Amino acid sequence: MVKVTFNSALAQKEAKKDESKSGEEALIIPPDAVAVDCKDPDEVVPVGQRRAWCWCMCFGLAFMLAGVILGGAYLYKYFAFQPDDVYYCGIKYIKDDVILNEPSADAPASRYQTIEENIKIFEEDEVEFISVPVPEFADSDPANIVHDFNKKLTAYLDLNLDKCYVIPLNTSIVMPPKNLLELLINIKAGTYLPQSYLIHEHMVITDRIENIDHLGFYIYRLCHDKETYKLQRRETIKGIQKRSADVCVTIRHFENRFAVETLICP
């Protein structure tokens, strides 16, 4: 009879080899597992910080959109609300308060003065814009004038001094936009109005206006970034009135069937 025996030491050695192989297989980790499971702490963004960044971005976009809308509205009002026609016309008037009774009556040429100006009418907004250029012979000053019937204000911009003057609208002298437009249409074929007379206005400069936002869009556009002052009307008379001081501003214009001389003094 043959007895089969096993070497225990050899069996233990084989068992240890099997355990070491299984251990090596368990320690094998795919290379991409490190990239997925392990991150740099500096690269991790907290959830609260990401939310704050999103809110800031949303508010920034909202402010940008609001600025675009407001800017577009201003540009639309600036460019769209333009008059269809600009009237260039003039008026002849007598230098003194003597008026010719007959249209065909003759008078010395030296007694006539001529006023020429550009007139724009914004009928829907009830605004008149008058541009008085530099006169060739008369001793008056160039100016831009705005009559705003909605705000019931008149603004004068002295182009020599680059200063603005604001006063309540005088409806007894200034013809409403609709009526003035009809008058201009009727005389569009001619260059000058029939001979007329001259009205004198004497105004005094008072307080400075620091904020002109409440004066309306058209006056704001006229007087923006310019020194602006209030005016007080001293008197309105027909006939000759001596100039009180050489420092006064004299503006000759018309927005009616007669001419107006506006004297603005300190």
UniProtKB/Swiss-Prot annotation:
Gene Ontology BP annotations: negative regulation of amyloid precursor protein biosynthetic process
Name of the molecule in the record: Integral membrane protein 2B
Disulfide cross-links: C164-C223, C248-C265
Record domain BRICHOS: where: 137-231
Post-translational modification: The ectodomain C-terminal part of the imBRI2 is processed by furin producing a secreted Bri23 peptide and a mature BRI2, membrane form (mBRI2). The remaining part of the ectodomain of mBRI2 containing the BRICHOS domain is cleaved by ADAM10 and is secreted (BRI2C, soluble form). The membrane-bound N-terminal fragment (BRI2C, membrane form) is further proteolytically processed by SPPL2A and SPPL2B through regulated intramembrane proteolysis producing a secreted C-peptide and a BRI2 intracellular domain (BRI2 ICD) released in the cytosol.
Keyword flag Disulfide bond: yes
Organism superkingdom: Eukaryota
PANTHER family: INTEGRAL MEMBRANE PROTEIN 2B, INTEGRAL TRANSMEMBRANE PROTEIN 2
Spans through the membrane: 55-75
Assembly, per entry: Homodimer; disulfide-linked. Interacts with SPPL2A and SPPL2B. Interacts with APP. Mature BRI2 (mBRI2) interacts with the APP amyloid-beta A4 protein; the interaction occurs at the cell surface and in the endocytic compartments and enable alpha- and beta-secretase-induced APP cleavage inhibition. Mature BRI2 (mBRI2) interacts with the APP C99; the interaction occurs in the endocytic compartments and enable gamma-secretase-induced C99 cleavage inhibition. May form heterodimers with Bri23 peptide and APP amyloid-beta protein 40.
Xref: InterPro entries: BRICHOS_dom, ITM2
Protein's gene: ITM2B
UniProt xrefs under PROSITE patterns: BRICHOS (PS50869)
Stretches in topological domain Cytoplasmic: 1-54
Record: glycosylation sites: N170
Protein function: Plays a regulatory role in the processing of the amyloid-beta A4 precursor protein (APP) and acts as an inhibitor of the amyloid-beta peptide aggregation and fibrils deposition. Plays a role in the induction of neurite outgrowth. Functions as a protease inhibitor by blocking access of secretases to APP cleavage sites.
Topological region Lumenal: 76-266
Classification of source organism: Eukaryota, Metazoa, Chordata, Craniata, Vertebrata
GO terms of molecular function: amyloid-beta binding
Signal peptide: none
CC per GO annotation: endosome membrane; extracellular space; Golgi apparatus; Golgi membrane; Golgi-associated vesicle membrane; organelle membrane; plasma membrane
Site entry (Cleavage), positions: R243, S244
Region called Necessary for interaction with APP and inhibitor effects on APP processing, residue ranges: 102-134
SMART domains reported for this sequence: BRICHOS (SM01039)
